[in-house]
C-alpha cells in the first residue's frame, strides 16, 4: 500500500495536536522504535490499565502530553495510533536491509504526521462536529465513527512519501475516482483519505465511460462511502449509478444527466441539484437528506428524509426565481405563470408523469403536513397569477388528479380554489366521453381520475342519466380495473344503486333479465347483464348488457359480436333482427358508433358487390345489396319472377357452365389483392365470399322459408367450387364439401335451406381462418 504524507496546515490544528506531532518528531529523530517495549493488539489492556492506574506495556515512553491529549477523550484512537506505530516498527525491521536508518526515520515521521492528523480529524468530527481539516483530511460522509476503524496499516512503506497535489483537471479527478472505486470493488478497505473527493471537478465527465459496465447495471456495483462535498458535476452524466452513504454537501449538480441514478443513505444537503432535461428516468433518493437543496419541479422524492426547515434564505440562481418550501427542501417555481410555465410545471399528463404536483405528492404519507403546506403555497402562487380558465383548461386533469385526493382535500384553501376547476373538468369529460369510449384506463387513470369522476357524479347525480354513456363507462372501469382500490369499487357500486333507483332507469330492470334477475346487479360475475345504458334520444329506450359485452363493444376486435345485448322499450325486450346496428348506434347509443364504424371499414365484402353490380348499370340493386349488409334480416325479397330474371341476367355471364369465368376470377383476385397470393389464401377468401352469398340467398336476407334467388345460390356454390379446386385442405372433408354443394342445388334429396349452409360454413371459417372471415363478412352478419 502506497502512503502519501499530504501536507498539514498547522495553523488550523489545535495546539495540543501541534505539540503531539512535535513530540513524535523528536522521538522519531532519536529512534522511536527503541522505546517501544511490547504492543499487543488486545481488547483489554488499554481500558483495564486506565481503570487501575497501573503501568501498561502499551504505555511506553511516549510523552505524557500524548496520553493527556487522548486519554480523557478517545482512548480507542490512542490504542490504534500505538498499534500503527508498532506496525511501522515491524515493517521497518523487515525492510531495514534495503532502507537506511535516516530514510526510516523520515518515513516514520511522515506517516505519523498523516496518521495523527487523520485520527484527530476523526475525533474532532465525531465529538465536536468540527469541519474536516484541510489538506485532504476528511471523515466519512455518513458522520459515523468508522473512519479510523477502517484504516489499514501499511504493508510496505514506499520511499515516495512526499505530498501529492490534487488532480488538476476533470479527467485527472475521473482517473483518481476510477482507481479508488476499482480498489473498493476488489475488496480493499479504503481509508477516509482514499474516499475523499471533496472539491473535486467532474464537469463534463460521462461516468459510464470511466467505470466498468457493472456499475450501470441493475443491482450492480455501488459507489459507497465517498465524500464528494463541494464538488462540481456540471454537465456530467451519472446515469444508472448507485451512490450509497456518500456525501455531496455544497456540491453543484447543474445540468447533470442522472437518469435512473440512485442516491441512498446519503447526505445531499445544500446541493444545487438541477438535472438536465435529457434525464429520461427520474433519479431516486432513498433515506437521503436534501436540506436546503434546490430541486427541480420534476423530481421523485419518495425516499427522501425531511427535517424541520431552518431560516436559510432561498438559493440564488441565474435569472432569479421563485421558490417554495417542501419541508427543508427548496422547490423552484416559475417567475411568471406563462402558458409554457403552466404546461411545464403542472401538466404531468403531457410531460411523462413529471410536474411539481407529482414531485410534492411523491413524498410518503408521513409528511402529509409538509405536502399540504407546499401545495397551499403553490395554490397561492397560481391564484396570484390570475390565470384565466382558458389557461388552466389544459391542466385541469393534472390538477384534480392530485389535489382532489387526500391529504389535500383537508385544506380549505385548496378545496375552495379547486372546486371550480373540478366542475369544469367534469363538464368537459361529460361533453367528450358520453358519445365516445374513454381511453383504456391505465394505473394512473384508475387510481387518480376515476375516483374524481365518481365524486363528481356523486355531487351532480342528474348527470348519471343525462350522460349515461360516460357514467356506465366509469362504473365499468371502476369495477373491472385491476388497479382500482376496494374503496373505489365500493363507492362505484353504491353510486350505481342510486342510478338504478332513478325513475328513468328503474322501469327497465324489473323484467327478469337484469343482473341477478331480481332487479339488482350481480357483481360476482362478468357475464351478468348488470349495465343499462339509456338512449340519448328516447328516454323510453335502453340497452342492457353484461360487463364482458360492454368492454368488447367499447374496445372491439374483429371477432366482436355487435348484437349480444337486450334492446328494451318501456322495459320490454324487443328484437334487433331488422334493426341496423349502425343506425341504432348513431341514433340512440353513439358511444359505440366510432368503434363500430372503425371495424366496419376493415370489412371488404362490398368490393365484390361493386364488381358485380356497378353503380352505373345497377345502382338500385347495388344499394339494396349493400343496405342488406347493415342488418341481420331484410324485408326486401328478390324471389319474384322479375327479380329472379334480372339477377339471372347479371350473374349468368359470370358462371359459364356453372363455374366462375376466368376473367371474373381474375377480377376477384385483383379486387382483394390476391394475384400473387398462395392458392390456400385465395381459397380461404373465396370460401368466405361464398359464405356471404349463401347468406344473401337465405330467408334472412333476399330469400324466404320456401324459396330463394337461384342466381345467388348458384354464385355462392361456384365460389365454393373454385375454393375446393385451389385448396381442398381448407375444407373439413370431401364429404362435407359434397353435402354443402348438394344443399345449394337440392341434389340427392339434400335439404336446400341455404341459411343452414351459411351458418355451417361460417362456423368452419371462424374456427380455421378467422382473420380472413373477419375481413370480409359484414359486421351485422358476424
Swiss-Prot record:
It catalyses: S-ubiquitinyl-[E2 ubiquitin-conjugating enzyme]-L-cysteine + [acceptor protein]-L-lysine = [E2 ubiquitin-conjugating enzyme]-L-cysteine + N(6)-ubiquitinyl-[acceptor protein]-L-lysine. Effector proteins function to alter host cell physiology and promote bacterial survival in host tissues. This protein is an E3 ubiquitin ligase that interferes with host's ubiquitination pathway. For instance, prevents host innate immune response by ubiquitinating and thus sending to degradation host E3 ubiquitin ligases TRIM56 and TRIM65. Required for inducing polymorphonuclear leukocytes migration across the intestinal epithelium. Preferentially uses host UBE2D1 (UBCH5A), UBE2D2 (UBCH5B) and UBE2L3 (UBCH7) as E2 ubiquitin-conjugating enzymes. The N-terminal 45 amino acids are necessary and sufficient for secretion and translocation into host cells. This N-terminal region binds the SpaK/InvB chaperone. Contains a C-terminal HECT-like domain. Ubiquitinated in the presence of host E1 ubiquitin-activating enzyme, E2 ubiquitin-conjugating enzyme and ubiquitin. Residues 157-171 have a biased composition (Low complexity). Its main location: secreted. It is found in: Secreted; Host cell. Belongs to the SopA E3 ligase family. Requires SpaK/InvB as a chaperone for its stability and for secretion. GO terms for biological process: protein ubiquitination. The active site is at residue 753. Interacts with SpaK/InvB. SUPFAM superfamilies: Pentapeptide repeat-like. One of its GO terms (cellular component) is host cell. This is E3 ubiquitin-protein ligase SopA. GO terms for molecular function: ubiquitin-protein transferase activity.
Amino acid at each position: 500500500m502506497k502512503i502519501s504524507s499530504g501536507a498539514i496546515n498547522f495553523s488550523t490544528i489545535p495546539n495540543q495536536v501541534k505539540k503531539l506531532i512535535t513530540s513524535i518528531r523528536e522521538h522519531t529523530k532519536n529512534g522511536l522504535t527503541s522505546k517501544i517495549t511490547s504492543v499487543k493488539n488486545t481488547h483489554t489492556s488499554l481500558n483495564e490499565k486506565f481503570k487501575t492506574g497501573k503501568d501498561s506495556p502499551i504505555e511506553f515512553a511516549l510523552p505524557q502530553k500524548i496520553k493527556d491529549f487522548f486519554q480523557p477523550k478517545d482512548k480507542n484512537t490512542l490504542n490504534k495510533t500505538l498499534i500503527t506505530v508498532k506496525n511501522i516498527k515491524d515493517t521497518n525491521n523487515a525492510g531495514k536491509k534495503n532502507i537506511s536508518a535516516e530514510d526510516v526515520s523520515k518515513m516514520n515521521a511522515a506517516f505519523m504526521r498523516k496518521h495523527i492528523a487523520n485520527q484527530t480529524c476523526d475525533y474532532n468530527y465525531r465529538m465536536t462536529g468540527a469541519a474536516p481539516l484541510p489538506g485532504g483530511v476528511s471523515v466519512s460522509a455518513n458522520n459515523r465513527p468508522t473512519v479510523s476503524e477502517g484504516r489499514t496499516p501499511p504493508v510496505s512503506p514506499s520511499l515516495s512519501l512526499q505530498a501529492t497535489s490534487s488532480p488538476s483537471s476533470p479527467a485527472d479527478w475521473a482517473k483518481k475516482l476510477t482507481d479508488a472505486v476499482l480498489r473498493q470493488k476488489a475488496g480493499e478497505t479504503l481509508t477516509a483519505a482514499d474516499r475523499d473527493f471533496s472539491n473535486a471537478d467532474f464537469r463534463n465527465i460521462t461516468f459510464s465511460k470511466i467505470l466498468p459496465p457493472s456499475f450501470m447495471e441493475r443491482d450492480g456495483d455501488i459507489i459507497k462511502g465517498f465524500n464528494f462535498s463541494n464538488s462540481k458535476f456540471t454537465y456530467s452524466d451519472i446515469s444508472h449509478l448507485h451512490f450509497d452513504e456518500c456525501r455531496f454537501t455544497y456540491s453543484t449538480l447543474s445540468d447533470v444527466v442522472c437518469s435512473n441514478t440512485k442516491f441512498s443513505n446519503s447526505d445531499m444537503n445544500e446541493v444545487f441539484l438541477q438535472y438536465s432535461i435529457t434525464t429520461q428516468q427520474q433519479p431516486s433518493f432513498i433515506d437521503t437528506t436534501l436540506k436546503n437543496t434546490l430541486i427541480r419541479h420534476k423530481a421523485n422524492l419518495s425516499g427522501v428524509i425531511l427535517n424541520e426547515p431552518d431560516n436559510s434564505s432561498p438559493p440564488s440562481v441565474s435569472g432569479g426565481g421563485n421558490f417554495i418550501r417542501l419541508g427543508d427542501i427548496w422547490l423552484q417555481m416559475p417567475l411568471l405563470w406563462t402558458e409554457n410555465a403552466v404546461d411545464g410545471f403542472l401538466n404531468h399528463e403531457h410531460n411523462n408523469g413529471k410536474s411539481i404536483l407529482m414531485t410534492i405528492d411523491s413524498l410518503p404519507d408521513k409528511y402529509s403536513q409538509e405536502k399540504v403546506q407546499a401545495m397551499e403555497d403553490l395554490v397561492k402562487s397560481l391564484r396570484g397569477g390570475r390565470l384565466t380558465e382558458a389557461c388552466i383548461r389544459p391542466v385541469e386533469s393534472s390538477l384534480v388528479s392530485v389535489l382532489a385526493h387526500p391529504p389535500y382535500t383537508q385544506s380549505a384553501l385548496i378545496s375552495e380554489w379547486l372546486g371550480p376547476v373540478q366542475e369544469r373538468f367534469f363538464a368537459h369529460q361529460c361533453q367528450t366521453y358520453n358519445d365516445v369510449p374513454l381511453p383504456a384506463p391505465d394505473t394512473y387513470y384508475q387510481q387518480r381520475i376515476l375516483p374524481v369522476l365518481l365524486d363528481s357524479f356523486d355531487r351532480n347525480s342528474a348527470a348519471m342519466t343525462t350522460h349515461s354513456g360516460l357514467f356506465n363507462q366509469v362504473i365499468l372501469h371502476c369495477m373491472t380495473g385491476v388497479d382500482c382500490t376496494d374503496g373505489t369499487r365500493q363507492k362505484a357500486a353504491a353510486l350505481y344503486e342510486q342510478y338504478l333507483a332513478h325513475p328513468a332507469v328503474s322501469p327497465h330492470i324489473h323484467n327478469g333479465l337484469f343482473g341477478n334477475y331480481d332487479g339488482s346487479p350481480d357483481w360476482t360475475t362478468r357475464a351478468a347483464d348488470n349495465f343499462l345504458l339509456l338512449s340519448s334520444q328516447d328516454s323510453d329506450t335502453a340497452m342492457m348488457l353484461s360487463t364482458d359485452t360492454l368492454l368488447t363493444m367499447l374496445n372491439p376486435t374483429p371477432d366482436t359480436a355487435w348484437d349480444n345485448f337486450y334492446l328494451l322499450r318501456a322495459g320490454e325486450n324487443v328484437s334487433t333482427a331488422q334493426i341496423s346496428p349502425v343506425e341504432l348506434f348513431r341514433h340512440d347509443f353513439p358511444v359505440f358508433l366510432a368503434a363500430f364504424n372503425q371495424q366496419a371499414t376493415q370489412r371488404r365484402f362490398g368490393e365484390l358487390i361493386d364488381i358485380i353490380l356497378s353503380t352505373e348499370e345497377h345502382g338500385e340493386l347495388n344499394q339494396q345489396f349493400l343496405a342488406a349488409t347493415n342488418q341481420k334480416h331484410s324485408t326486401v325479397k328478390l324471389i319474384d319472377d322479375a327479380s329472379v330474371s334480372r339477377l339471372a341476367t347479371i350473374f349468368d355471364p359470370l358462371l359459364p357452365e356453372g363455374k366462375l369465368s376466368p376473367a371474373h376470377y381474375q377480377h376477384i383476385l385483383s379486387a382483394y389483392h390476391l394475384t400473387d397470393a398462395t392458392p390456400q389464401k385465395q381459397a380461404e377468401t373465396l370460401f368466405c365470399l361464398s359464405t356471404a352469398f349463401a347468406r344473401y340467398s337465405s330467408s334472412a336476407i333476399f330469400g324466404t322459408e320456401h324459396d330463394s334467388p337461384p342466381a345467388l345460390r348458384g354464385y355462392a356454390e361456384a365460389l365454393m367450387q373454385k375454393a375446393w379446386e385451389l385448396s381442398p385442405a381448407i375444407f373439413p372433408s370431401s364429404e362435407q364439401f359434397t353435402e354443402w354443394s348438394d344443399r345449394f342445388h337440392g341434389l340427392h334429396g339434400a335439404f336446400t335451406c341455404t341459411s343452414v349452409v351459411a351458418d355451417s360454413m361460417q362456423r368452419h371459417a371462424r374456427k380455421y381462418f378467422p382473420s380472413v372471415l373477419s375481413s370480409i363478412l359484414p359486421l351485422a352478419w358476424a
